[in-house]
């Protein structure tokens, strides 16, 4: 069973992986806890200690928006994938993706809702980006965009900036999903851009990614497709699920777990009437509990229920007195990013309504109690020690190799009942790595605890610059990834718009039509998640 994380998979268009694509810039020297107070940057030492929690959160939003503006080309309205701490145009990454473009669009709406920019500026920015999108090369039969573009021109990348490595244009199901979600938000929230946003969205065929003949009854979503011969050695097959235009090269990889950011594509297909609702129940909650599946992280417990004619094993993992439906890696991003747009907890109170707050609690308890880091919030991010890495809480992931929470990749292994003995049920953790965007997502469920955690990250660790929170920080060494990632900053903006702006993202996305089509589907389910 081949599994590729979304953020790794979007790089599949490269013939070879370019080293250091998102290389972080560690601090010149590691900072010991005792030395932190004397080594804090002047920028954040000057922050007022008397500001209210709401004022502090709005300041965080304002500075985060500053980084997104700095990433965005003033001629095309396209954001770069990332930018260094300098926020200088010369330090932009030189490439962007549909996810990044979508993130900038919903961030502009969030900035307006938070009163950081005017209605007029929001409309101008959004329309500029949409006008560029309308001219960009894409897969015309499906309306889907390719994975990498030059943000300064909008041209499809065929060679990687800085290395010259060949790029094979690839249409990713989940990256187009985030662009689609953003277009839905814009269509509802920005009247001056509604027509163009609607035109771009309406041409997107989500069933292009839907494989009704996949291994799971109900069908699964492909990772994506190439519309020209793929890189040598790629695992693909040719076909065309919508029967329009030439055949494409589909990935043999599918997204088959529910607690994943990739469920946004299933949602959009169901909303559009292009993917049958039962596809939502084709994905695993956990894998089965038998010894044949003992390769997964731990042994789930649960019962089988039937929805829309499909039997679903409602498994959950046990962690610190909680029963939680795990993701693939145990990251906040997998659990909560779709919830920025779809009010999952209220629409599905017996499933997501249990799992979301339990996942947040589990991440907090892992960082503060089990690992003793003193900070929490674990999700894929820039690696403070160079590059990019998936971070998470290993115990909350199906993947036995984990998304680990520390630099040392400390592996939690509780065993699998009588099938596999435990090798490391009570680990000793090392230099934990937290990413602020995880705490902003968590703020939708634990606002006070998340804000307190972020305040400590800013004041005690100094992981803050002119563009808001730096992407990640190792809490014991004090090593900081001094860079801003477009997607992570956009998750911060979307979360703040919900927390401070009266669920602005959800209100714009979850229209009556969306509710009629999606809420009955996700609302019928009962997860195995619960607190003891």
Protein language model features and the residues they cover:
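Short, polar/charged, Gly/Pro-enriched helix-capping and turn/loop motifs at alpha-helix termini
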Residues: 16, 23-24, 118, 506
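Ser/Thr/Asn(+Pro)-rich, low-complexity disordered segments
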Residues: 39-532
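Intrinsically disordered, low-complexity, compositionally biased regions/tails
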Residues: 16-17, 24, 147, 396
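C-terminal region of N-terminal signal peptides and the immediate post-cleavage residues
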Residues: 21-38
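Residue-level marker of structural boundaries
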Residues: 18-19, 501
């Amino acid at each position: 069973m081949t599994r590729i994380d979304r953020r790794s998979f979007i790089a599949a268009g490269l013939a070879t992986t370019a080293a250091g694509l998102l290389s972080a810039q560690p601090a010149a020297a590691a900072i010991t806890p005792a030395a932190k107070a004397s080594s804090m940057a002047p920028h954040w030492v000057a922050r007022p200690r008397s500001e209210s929690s709401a004022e502090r959160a709005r300041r965080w939003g304002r500075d985060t928006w500053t980084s997104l503006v700095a990433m965005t080309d003033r001629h095309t309205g396209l954001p770069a994938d990332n930018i260094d701490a300098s926020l200088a145009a010369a330090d932009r990454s030189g490439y962007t993706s549909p996810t990044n473009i979508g993130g900038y669009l919903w961030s502009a709406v969030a900035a307006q809702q938070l009163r950081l920019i005017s209605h007029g500026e929001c409309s101008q920015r959004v329309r500029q980006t949409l006008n560029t999108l309308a001219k960009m090369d894409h897969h015309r039969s499906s309306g889907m965009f390719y994975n990498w573009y030059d943000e300064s021109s909008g041209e499809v990348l065929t060679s990687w900036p800085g290395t010259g490595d060949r790029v094979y244009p690839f249409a990713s199901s989940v990256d187009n999903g985030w662009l689609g979600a953003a277009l839905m938000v814009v269509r509802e929230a920005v009247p001056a851009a509604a027509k163009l946003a609607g035109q771009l969205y309406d041409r997107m065929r989500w069933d292009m990614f839907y494989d009704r003949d996949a291994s799971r009854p109900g069908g699964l979503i492909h990772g994506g497709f190439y519309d020209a011969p793929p890189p040598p050695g790629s695992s693909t097959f040719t076909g065309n699920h919508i029967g329009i235009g030439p055949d494409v090269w589909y990935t043999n990889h599918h997204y088959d777990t529910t607690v994943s950011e990739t469920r946004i594509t299933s949602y959009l297909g169901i909303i559009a009437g292009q993917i049958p609702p039962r596809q939502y129940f084709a994905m695993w909650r956990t894998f089965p509990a038998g010894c044949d599946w003992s390769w997964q992280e731990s042994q789930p417990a649960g019962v089988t229920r039937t929805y829309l004619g499909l039997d679903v094993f409602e498994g959950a993992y046990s962690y610190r007195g909680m029963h939680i439906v795990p993701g693939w890696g145990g990251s906040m991003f997998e659990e909560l990013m779709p919830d920025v747009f779809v009010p999952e907890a209220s629409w599905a109170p017996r499933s997501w309504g249990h799992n979301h707050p339990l996942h947040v609690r589990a991440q907090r308890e892992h960082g503060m109690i089990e690992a003793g880091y003193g900070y929490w919030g674990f999700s894929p991010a820039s690696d403070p020690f160079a590059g990019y890495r998936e971070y998470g809480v290993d115990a909350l992931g199906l993947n036995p190799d984990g998304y680990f929470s520390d630099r040392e990749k400390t592996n939690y292994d509780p065993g699998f009942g009588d099938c596999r003995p435990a090798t490391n049920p009570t680990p000793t953790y090392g230099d934990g790595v937290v990413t602020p965007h995880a705490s902003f997502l968590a703020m939708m469920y634990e606002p006070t605890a998340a804000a307190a955690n972020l305040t400590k990250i800013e004041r005690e660790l100094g992981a803050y610059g002119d563009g808001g929170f730096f992407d990640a920080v190792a809490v014991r060494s004090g090593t900081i990834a001094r860079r801003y990632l477009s997607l992570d900053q956009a998750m911060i903006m979307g979360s703040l718009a919900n927390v401070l702006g009266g669920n602005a993202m959800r209100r714009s996305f979850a229209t009556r039509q969306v509710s009629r089509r999606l809420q009955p589907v996700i609302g019928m389910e009962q997860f195995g998640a619960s607190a003891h």
